Amino acid sequence: MARAQNEAASEVDGVLNLLKPPGMTSHDVVAFVRRALGVKKAGHTGTLDPGVAGVLPVCVGRATRLAEYIAGSDKAYRAEITFGVATDTQDGFGEVVAEADASHLTRGDVAYALTRFHGPIEQVPPMVSAVKVGGKRLYELARKGVEVEREPRRVFIHRLQLLDFRPGPRPVAYIDVVCSKGTYVRTLAHDLGRFLQVGAHLSYLVRTRSGPFVLAQAATLEELAAGKARLLPPAAALGDMPRVTVSGRAAARVLHGVAPAVRVEHPDGTTVAVVAANGALLALAEADGGGLRLRKVFG
C-alpha cells in the first residue's frame, strides 16, 4: 500500500496557485503542500516576506523545473504606504528610526513623486532581506546588528497607480505596483519617503499577481487541505511564452530529446514552449539560428 501511495504521489505534476496568508513563510507553505498532497518534490516560485499575503505559485513534481520561469516573471502588488514614519526594516515590523510631520503632503505631491519612479530604477536592497553579501544573507547580518554596504540593483517599474490618498500628520497612500523580478516594494516606499523628505514605510502589502497567476483565482490553504484546490497543468505556467505545437511522431521524438524541425523567427536565446496538440507541455526549447534547441523535456 505504501509503495502504491508513493507511486501515485510521484505522478502528481502541476502548479498550485495559492494564497499565502500573513504570518507564514514561503517555505511553510511549501511544507504544507507536501503534507497535503503527500509529495516530496515541491517548491515555491519567489519568496514573499512572512508578513505579506498574496499569490504564491507552488510547483509540484516535474513542474518544479518551471519554477525559475515563474520566479523570473513580472509581479503585481497592492501596497499601503504610511508617510512620516521610517523604520529600520522599511515595513511595519521594524523599529521606528525617524518621524516627521507630513501633514503638508497632498495627493498631488504623492502622484508627482510616483512619476519619478517609473521605468528602470536603482534600488539598494534592505538589510533585512535574503540577498547575499560575502556569502551571508543580509538578514543574518542584520540580526547581529551588522550593517554592510550593498550594491544598488536595477529593477523595472512598469506601473505605479495611486488609488487613494488619506491626508493627515501620517498620510497614507494606496497604490498598485507592477514590477520586475527582484523589486522590493518596501524599498520603493522608503525611497518615496526620502524623495518627499518626510520618511515612509510600507504598512501593508498583498501580491496580486505572479506571472500568469492572479489573486482572484488563488486557493487558500484550507481549500487545499479539503481537496478543493485545483492542480493546474504545467503549461499553465507559460503565460505569454512563445509556443510551437507538434503532434504525432514529432511529439514522440521531442519526448526522446529530439528537437522539432521547425523554423522560428524569435531572437536567439528566446525560450519557446513545445506543446502537444492537446496543449500539454512537452519541452522547453531555446531559439537558435532560426531553429530550436531543447533545454528541458517533460516526458
Swiss-Prot record:
Record EC number: 5.4.99.25
Record's keyword annotation contains Isomerase: yes
Pfam family, one: TruB_N
Classification via InterPro entries: PsdUridine_synth_cat_dom_sf, PsdUridine_synth_N, tRNA_psdUridine_synth_TruB, TruB_C
Molecular functions per Gene Ontology: RNA binding; tRNA pseudouridine(55) synthase activity
Broad EC category: isomerase
Protein name in UniProt: tRNA pseudouridine synthase B
Primary gene name: truB
